[in-house]
Amino acid sequence: MSRLLTRFDELKQQNRAALVTFITAGDPDYATSLQILKGLPAAGADVIELGMPFTDPMADGPAIQLANIRALAAKQDLAKTLQMVREFRQDDQTTPIVLMGYFNPIHKMGVERFIAEAVEAGVDGLIVVDLPPEHNEDLCDPAQAAGIDFIRLTTPTTDDKRLPVVLNGSSGFVYYVSVAGVTGAGSATLEHVEEAVARLKRHTELPVCVGFGIRTPEQAAAIARLTEGVVVGSALIDQIANAKSNAQAVEGVLELCRQISTGVRSARA
């Protein structure tokens, strides 16, 4: 069983949702980012999404766009992002890591080489936001053949006709974007999320993780009662952006992660 499915299985037995945390690789620099990455599991992260920096992250809001700019300024690239995963795996063999980003850097590296290196580094899943299911053969199919899950985004505008197409070939989990638009935007109403999760569950047996707009332990707890996973990204990235030093960035991210984790873990208690 994959690391992702194993983790969701464990959490189901514990009757709690996963806390899925997002950071951008190399933000604000390689060493600090690696320190944050290595600290996230102990701070309560159950699954980690690691952003692959790209020059044109059009699906992301201002916070993550700025994180991409900081990481690229610090000379982060896809090879270094894979190296970060290798270094993380020296200490942690159980926490799933999902690389999230855009197809261009993968295409430039070469799909075959990228998949081989991702497997060797210990990557568990991919979210590639600009690669629709009509292009499964470009990356989804070969990635899954190599044992890497391919996770799809669904949104409030994904209708019942489109949903089976989007879910075709999905594995690992389904990422529900609770607010149509860019990441980090406002938060959705709980009723809306509950209805959306129920609709997804009619189409898939995969765990559903809900993200976008979750910034507090209370919001995370409310979502954790409704679904298998809570995704937090922009709120963590803001801790890096607002920090006066790299040490403060590390502590800010990990402390917020601890607080949100407490909310998620107490949600169904």
Curated annotation (Swiss-Prot):
It catalyses: (1S,2R)-1-C-(indol-3-yl)glycerol 3-phosphate + L-serine = D-glyceraldehyde 3-phosphate + L-tryptophan + H2O. InterPro entries: Aldolase_TIM (IPR013785), RibuloseP-bd_barrel (IPR011060), Trp_synthase_alpha_AS (IPR018204), Trp_synthase_suA (IPR002028). The alpha subunit is responsible for the aldol cleavage of indoleglycerol phosphate to indole and glyceraldehyde 3-phosphate. The active site is at residues 49, 60. One of its GO terms (cellular component) is cytosol. Belongs to the TrpA family. Coiled coil: none annotated. GO terms for molecular function: tryptophan synthase activity. Transmembrane segments: none annotated. Its EC number is 4.2.1.20. HAMAP family: Trp_synth_alpha (MF_00131). Tetramer of two alpha and two beta chains. The lineage of its organism: Bacteria, Pseudomonadati, Pseudomonadota, Gammaproteobacteria, Pseudomonadales. Pathway: Amino-acid biosynthesis; L-tryptophan biosynthesis; L-tryptophan from chorismate: step 5/5. This is Tryptophan synthase alpha chain. Keywords: Amino-acid biosynthesis, Aromatic amino acid biosynthesis, Lyase, Tryptophan biosynthesis. CDD domains: Tryptophan_synthase_alpha (cd04724).
